[in-house]
């Protein structure tokens, strides 16, 4: 069946947001007395839900993890999200897809209101029919995508999930979407996306329209 609904990850797919995310982790570690980590280590935290990352770092200390999440989000909302910008070619890709009548949505592990504010601040909100993210009821990529599909009444067999990390691909598979599309300009790599079972890999935003038409 023809694809009609395209669900995009946000960080590493639409936005180059690494500087703000890494700075938010550094601030949180300083505030929480946690040793600083290398940029390479911090980059692995981009994509998974924040709760999972801090639960791992907390090593069983739930109170520490909860406080760290609050600290991170406070900094990110005030400063970190302002440091993001769309990748080269993203705006043109979104406009081309809209001209071909695809319905575009965001399905991100970012906190939902933060994702909405980021895209509004970057004047990108108008390209999306819905912006869905992490909420207490939906905190994994699989659950966020399920919520997105349900609320938009999008059928999985006419939908695709597009993202840069294995979580995006797995989320798409677990929701039985027609295609999972891995992007190579973000924070994952070809090996990660292939191992996750991505149906298609693209290296530049403009390739998306070519491969789904």
PLM features: what roles do these ranges have?
Residues 91-98, 149, 169-174:
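Surface-exposed amphipathic alpha-helices with a cationic face
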Residues 5, 142-169:
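Conserved Lys-Pro-Asp/Glu-containing loop-to-beta segment of HAD-superfamily phosphomonoesterases
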Residues 25, 93-119, 134:
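Substrate-recognition element of Asp-dependent hydrolases with the DxDx(T/V) motif
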Residues 45, 125-139:
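A short, structured active-site edge motif that brings together acidic residues
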Residues 35, 125-129, 155:
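Conserved H-loop
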Residues 160-200:
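Acidic, Mg2+-coordinating phosphoryl-transfer loop and its flanking beta/alpha structural elements
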């Amino acid at each position: 069946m023809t694809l009609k609904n395209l669900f995009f990850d946000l960080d590493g797919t639409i936005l180059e947001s690494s500087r703000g995310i890494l700075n938010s982790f550094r601030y949180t570690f300083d505030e929480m007395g946690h040793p600083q980590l290398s940029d390479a280590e911090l980059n692995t935290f981009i994509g998974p839900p924040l709760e999972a990352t801090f639960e791992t770092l907390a090593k069983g200390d739930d109170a520490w993890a909860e406080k760290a999440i609050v600290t991170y989000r406070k900094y990110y909302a005030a400063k970190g999200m302002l440091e993001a910008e769309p990748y080269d070619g993203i705006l043109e890709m979104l406009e081309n897809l809209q001209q071909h009548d695809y319905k575009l949505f965001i399905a991100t592990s970012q906190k939902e209101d933060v994702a909405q504010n980021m895209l509004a601040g970057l004047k990108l909100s108008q390209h999306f029919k819905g912006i869905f993210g992490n909420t207490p009821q939906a905190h994994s990529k699989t659950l966020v995508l399920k919520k997105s599909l349900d609320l938009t009444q999008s059928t999985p067999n006419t939908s695709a999930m597009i993202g840069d990390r294995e979580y995006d691909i797995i989320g798409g598979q677990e929701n039985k979407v027609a295609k999972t599309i891995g992007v190579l300009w973000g924070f994952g790599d070809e090996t990660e996306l292939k191992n996750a079972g991505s149906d298609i890999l693209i290296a530049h935003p403009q390739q998306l329209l070519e491969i789904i038409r």
